[in-house]
């Protein structure tokens, strides 16, 4: 495949093996939302209770990198929506989760105009003040690029800028090192991973299902969609039940992110 293909990704996957466990959420509200990525606060409480009852221990992304324990699990959120400032504190207090939020820094304090769903309903991103507050109560922050564009479609100069600018902005806001990132639209390739490593990232995440052969610079995650129950998430984590169906559904959902890519191209964005 050409490195210009935004959906190109290097395969580090050995099918159906044990792996480091990472969940990825996006929106966390009770409101009606376009798309499949909204999950209500009540339902995430039920899920976190189920994970705890099944012996899972919540750890940070950095702690997971050094773990060799299939019962440790990291909680991540892509896009950094503003409602997380209200939704996360009670979850941190009750379940002692150590979440990481991946933020497209060009949109701090702005609406999600990068997303095709914003045509129907726009959503605000975290403000600088909200990021500062969440960082103070133990939330980690990572990069989701600067402008939420497909990184593999960029030339080397633009790629380096996306990686470094977002990192620098978050470090300036939080006063803490930023060493992790989530690839916009969930895809990467060897050139992007090399650039991420050069920029100082120690871990980076895709939207592919995880596997124990994943590179630290292309780690898969288990996505949680609005229709998921604790049982279906357990199937995804344990590679049981309808796991092949869930894996195929994840691939299809990731492919649908082409809508965002096409909108940005139509609007003349990089």
Feature map (PLM): residue ranges:
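C-terminal active-site subregion of NodB/CE4 polysaccharide deacetylases
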Residues: 1-75, 82-85, 153-180, 186-270
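Acidic (Asp/Glu)-rich catalytic clusters
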Residues: 16, 52-53, 90-97, 124-143, ...
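Short, glycine/acidic-enriched loop or turn micro-motifs at the edges of active sites
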Residues: 81-82, 147
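A short, conserved beta-to-alpha structural element at the edge of catalytic cores
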Residues: 96-118
């Amino acid at each position: 495949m050409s490195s210009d293909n935004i959906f190109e990704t290097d395969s580090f996957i050995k099918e159906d093996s044990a792996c480091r466990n990472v969940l990825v959420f996006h929106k966390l509200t009770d409101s009606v939302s376009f798309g499949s990525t909204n999950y209500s606060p009540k339902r995430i409480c039920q899920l976190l209770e189920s994970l705890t009852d099944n012996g899972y221990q919540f750890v940070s992304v950095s702690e997971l990198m050094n773990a060799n324990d299939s019962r440790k699990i990291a909680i991540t959120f892509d896009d950094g929506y503003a409602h997380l400032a209200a939704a996360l504190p009670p979850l941190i207090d009750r379940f002692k989760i150590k979440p990481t939020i991946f933020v497209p820094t060009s949109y701090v304090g702005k609406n999600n105009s990068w997303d095709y769903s914003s045509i129907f309903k726009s959503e605000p991103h975290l403000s600088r003040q909200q990021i500062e507050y969440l960082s103070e109560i133990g939330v980690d922050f990572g990069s989701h690029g600067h402008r939420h564009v497909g990184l593999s479609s960029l030339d080397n100069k633009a790629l380096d800028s996306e990686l470094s600018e977002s990192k620098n902005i978050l470090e300036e806001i939080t006063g803490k090192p930023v060493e992790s990132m989530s690839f916009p639209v969930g895809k990467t390739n060897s050139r992007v991973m090399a650039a991420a490593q050069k920029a100082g990232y120690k871990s980076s995440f895709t939207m592919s299902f995880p596997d124990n052969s994943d590179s630290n610079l292309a780690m898969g995650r288990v996505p949680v969609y609005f229709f998921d129950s604790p049982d279906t998430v357990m199937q995804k984590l344990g590679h049981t039940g309808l796991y092949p169906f869930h894996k195929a559904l994840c691939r299809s959902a990731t492919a649908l992110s082409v809508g965002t890519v096409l909108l940005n191209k139509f609007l003349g964005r990089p």
